[in-house]
C-alpha cells in the first residue's frame, strides 16, 4: 500500500541470508506470488551456488522459482562471467547488472592522483568504497576513460554500453545508479 501499487512486478531477495534456510525464504516469496502481491521473484548479489540451491529447492517443493539475478558487473568487476552468467543462461534467468560504472570509478571523475570530488563515494571514507576506488582501480579506469574519449564516448556512457552489450545481459536491463549527472551514462551524446 505504501508503494501505491496493487502488486510488485519483480521482488528481489537482496543478498542471501546464510543463516536462513532457502526453503523458508522461498516459501515466503512463493506466498507473495500466490497472493497476487508479486508477479516474479529474483535475487540480487547471490553467489551462483546459492542461486542453484534456490532453484533446486523451488523445483523440489513446487514453489515459484527465481527468474533473475542482479549482480555487480562492470568492465573492472567481471567475476560473474565465471559462474553466474553461464548459470543464468542455462537456467533461463535474466541478468540485471548493477554498478555498471563501478560506483562512479568508470565515470572519469576519480583521477590517478588519489583525490576524490567532494561529496563523492570516494570522499565518503566508507571502507567498501576505499577498496573499490583503489589506486590500481583508478589507473585502470583512467586507461578505460582515455580509450573511450579517444573514440568520442563519455567514459560512463562507454562503461554502461560495455555492460549492456555483454552476452547474457538483456540490453535494457543494467541499473545505472548514478548519484549525479556527472556519473550518468544517460548524458547527451546518444551512444549508450
Task: Report the location of each language-model feature.
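Short coil/turn motifs that cap or connect alpha-helices
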Residues: 6-8, 94, 154
Amino acid at each position: 500500500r505504501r508503494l501505491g501499487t496493487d502488486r510488485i512486478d519483480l521482488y528481489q531477495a537482496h543478498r542471501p541470508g546464510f543463516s536462513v534456510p532457502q526453503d523458508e525464504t522461498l516459501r515466503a516469496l512463493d506466498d507473495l506470488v500466490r497472493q497476487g502481491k508479486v508477479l516474479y521473484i529474483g535475487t540480487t548479489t547471490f553467489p551462483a551456488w546459492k542461486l542453484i540451491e534456490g532453484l533446486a529447492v523451488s523445483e523440489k517443493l513446487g514453489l515459484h522459482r527465481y527468474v533473475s539475478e542482479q549482480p555487480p558487473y562492470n568492465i573492472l568487476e567481471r567475476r560473474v562471467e565465471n559462474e553466474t552468467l553461464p548459470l543464468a543462461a542455462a537456467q533461463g534467468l535474466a541478468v540485471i547488472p548493477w554498478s555498471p560504472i563501478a560506483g562512479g570509478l568508470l565515470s572519469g571523475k576519480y583521477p590517478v592522483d588519489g583525490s576524490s570530488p567532494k561529496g563523492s563515494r570516494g570522499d565518503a571514507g566508507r571502507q567498501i568504497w576505499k577498496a573499490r576506488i583503489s589506486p590500481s582501480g583508478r589507473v585502470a579506469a583512467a586507461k578505460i576513460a582515455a580509450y573511450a574519449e579517444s573514440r568520442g564516448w563519455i567514459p560512463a556512457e562507454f562503461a554502461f554500453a560495455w555492460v549492456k552489450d555483454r552476452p547474457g545481459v538483456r540490453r535494457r536491463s543494467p541499473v545505472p545508479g548514478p548519484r549525479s549527472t556527472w556519473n550518468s551514462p544517460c548524458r547527451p551524446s546518444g551512444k549508450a
